[in-house]
């Protein structure tokens, strides 16, 4: 009985000591934003969805290639933000990390131009889809500075600029790899939330 109790207490102390502030991006990290947005765009513009997906265009390339994109942008993102699907096992892994005493701090570049009210849109979606979080920051251009201010221990994002921004301030950075985003050098890489969980405590 004493051995079991000692093991439990020791394990508890380890978990408490390992508490971290985990910074997490939303689009294409928690959600399948790219795929969902292309589905909406293909319907709006009458384009071949499979062909559009296979081209692996970046967001900037998509914007430049579509007529009147600026006129439709807010509507496109508004529909996407409400209907976007989640990455596999993201809810389970984030809940597990939070249950282990870590703080989940969501940091997104979602802005007022594309989303109207990015905080409201994001908050309602996250709560409605049972995504656990302790803080939510929107319209963040310089994620490196914010991560430093919030004492982030480890950060995950798909975007090249964001990963470089955070990595450059000395914070452990993980890129969530996608087919349409170049890989960042000098950071860790995962392609699933299960992989990220395995990486967190290494």
What kind of region is each of these model predictions?
Residues 110-154, 160-164:
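Substrate-recognition "cap/lid" segment bordering the active-site pocket of phosphatases
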Residues 17-69:
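Active-site neighborhood of HAD-like aspartate-dependent phosphohydrolases
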Residues 81, 90-122:
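Substrate-recognition element of Asp-dependent hydrolases with the DxDx(T/V) motif
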Residues 62-77, 102-104:
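Short, basic/glycine-rich phosphate-binding loops at helix/coil junctions
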